[in-house]
Amino acid sequence: KLKYINPPFETERISGYDFLLDKLSGKISSAACEYVFTRDVWKKTGGFVRFPLAWCSDDATWAKFADYTAGIISLPGTPVYWRNAENKNISNSMRFDGEKLKATGLFLKWIGMNYRLNLRESRFQDALVTYVNVILECSVRGNYTLKDLFSLYAILRKLSPTMALRVLRSHILKAKLFI
């Protein structure tokens, strides 16, 4: 059963930055099985970006591959169908929330290292704030402590103090003292 179809790209080819902008802002939603790349690209770029549980690894990897190959193209035709085993993967499990938060922090650091020049753009900052809000509210369903929140805040603060304060202000009263 088809649940979601992404809107088409606005241009024939999008950069790694534009992919991240769309992904972080929630404009597109995709899974690893929707991306095709050559072994040569994989080898020449150093393979997959590694984060705990591979959480965020796919998005970082596709952005990296896109920057290496001058973009991602969308193939027209039938959408990809894939089986999402409800309650059988890490996305739906509270058991891995701590590792998801750690990986999210590493992903944010990766973005800071690879897209530093874009961090001044308000639309990129808005997308990053939206992304962190979705992680805290949906992916870990509010299952985070003040320590977790301040860890993300410290990482975001290095990217943009304003961005960090926006996230902190939205979640400080929702954080648990302990889990």
Q: How does the language model describe each region?
A:
Residues 2-95:
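Conserved nucleotide-sugar donor-binding catalytic segment
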Residues 45-49, 115, 139:
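Short amphipathic alpha-helical interaction patches enriched in hydrophobic/aromatic residues
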Residues 54, 70, 78-86, 91-119, ...:
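Catalytic core of nucleotide-sugar-dependent glycosyltransferases
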Residues 59-62, 104, 132:
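Hydrophobic alpha-helical core bundles mediating ligand binding, dimerization, or RNAP-core interactions
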Residues 119-126, 167:
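Structural motif
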Residues 125-138:
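Amphipathic alpha-helical repeat scaffolds of TPR domains
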Residues 135-179:
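Membrane-interface aromatic/basic loop that binds lipid-linked glycans or pyrophosphate carriers
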